[in-house]
Every structure is written in structure tokens, then in C-alpha cells.
């Protein structure tokens, strides 16, 4: 079973639905924040809370983005709840995938890696290169592939490479670090 947290759940579900594998998806929303753009009735109908799943185990967790990247992490109204979810994921989730702002949050929470401003909004589709073809998550990727970005912040390559638990799997000259793996938590078979 896969748990999808924060926002962007519908997109993640559509992306995961094109597979012969049977996947059960649970969508979770943080309860410490009231959404300005999604109705409470929609959230109550399609999402659960962290408290409701706290004692469960999941094969995967996807922590998605949020339009809060210009704020300091501790200023985000639901940071404490998200930090609790990330801590819980260490024991209750087999594999966690952080995307967009969720990736910046995960790198900060788990490794103390600070986000850094890009100087101007990075927006567009950029060329990326694989750095390790043997990793299972990128086996079907071309050596060079294109991916979209829309953000004001990223992380420094040197900060990622300086952490012995992290492996940079893909990067872009224009967009920077793209795909980072935790070697301690998720080892290749």
C-alpha cells in the first residue's frame, strides 16, 4: 500500500495507475493546516489524517510539494506535523519518495541540508544526465533525459556529495541536483 501525503495526490495517483501491479493508495492531508484552495468536504471525503494511519505500515510514502518554498521550514504552519510524519516514516514505511518542496523538506529534516535560492525562478524543461545507471530507480532512464522544474530554491551539489548517506543519481547543468538517494535507508538489491 502506498501513502501519499500533502498535495498533488491526484497527479501521483494518475502516474502510478498505469501499471500491471495492484496498488492500494491512501491519501493523507496534514490536519494542522486548513487548505485555502481545496474544500473541506473534498479533503474529508478523499483524505485521511496522520493520526488515523499512525499505527499502520506502508510500502511507500510520497511526500509532495506545497507553495511554501520561500518560507523557512519552521515557519510553515504544519512543519511540526510533517516532521513527525517524516520521523514516523523511518519505522513504518519501506520507501519514501520526496518530490518538489517535499524533497527540500526531506533533505533539511533528515540531513540538515539547507535550501538555497536560485536567484530567479527556475521554470522550464531541462536536460539531465544520469550519474549511475545501475540504480534500480533509473534503469529505464536514458543517459540524458528531460524533466520540468518550477521553483525558486534548490540544494547545493557539494552539500549532497558531502553527506556519506546520500548518492546523487541525476543532475542538470542548468537545474542542479535532480534525483538523490539515501544509501543508508534504501540499498539496492
Regions picked out by a protein language model, each given a short descriptive name:
Residues 1-8, 13, 186-189:
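Single conserved hydrophobic/aromatic residue that forms the stacking wall/gate
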Residues 7, 56, 91, 143, ...:
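Structured loop/turn residues at beta-strand edges in well-structured enzyme cores
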Residues 21-34:
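A short beta-strand-loop structural module common to alpha/beta enzyme folds
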Residues 39-54:
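Glycine-rich, highly charged phosphate/nucleotide-binding loops
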Residues 58, 63-134:
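Cysteine-nucleophile active-site neighborhood
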Residues 109-188:
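Pocket-forming structural segment of enzyme catalytic cores
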Amino acid at each position: 500500500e502506498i501513502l501519499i501525503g500533502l498535495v498533488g495526490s491526484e497527479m501521483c495517483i494518475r502516474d502510478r495507475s498505469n501499471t500491471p501491479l495492484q496498488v492500494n493508495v491512501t491519501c493523507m492531508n496534514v490536519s494542522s493546516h486548513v487548505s485555502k484552495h481545496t474544500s473541506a468536504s473534498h479533503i474529508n471525503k478523499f483524505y485521511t489524517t496522520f493520526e488515523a494511519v499512525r499505527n499502520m505500515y506502508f510500502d511507500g510514502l510520497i511526500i509532495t510539494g506545497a507553495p511554501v518554498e520561500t518560507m523557512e521550514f519552521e515557519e510553515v504552519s504544519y512543519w511540526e506535523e510533517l516532521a513527525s510524519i517524516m520521523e514516523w516514516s523511518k519505522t513504518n514505511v519501506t520507501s519514501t519518495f520526496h518530490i518538489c518542496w517535499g524533497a527540500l523538506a526531506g533533505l533539511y529534516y533528515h540531513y540538515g541540508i539547507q535550501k538555497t535560492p536560485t536567484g530567479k525562478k527556475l521554470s522550464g524543461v531541462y536536460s539531465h544526465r544520469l550519474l549511475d545507471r545501475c540504480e534500480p530507480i533509473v534503469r529505464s532512464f536514458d543517459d540524458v533525459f528531460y524533466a520540468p522544474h518550477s521553483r525558486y530554491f534548490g540544494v547545493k551539489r557539494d552539500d549532497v556529495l558531502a553527506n556519506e548517506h546520500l548518492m546523487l543519481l541525476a543532475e542538470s547543468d542548468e537545474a542542479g541536483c535532480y534525483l538523490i538517494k539515501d544509501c543508508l535507508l534504501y540499498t539496492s538489491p
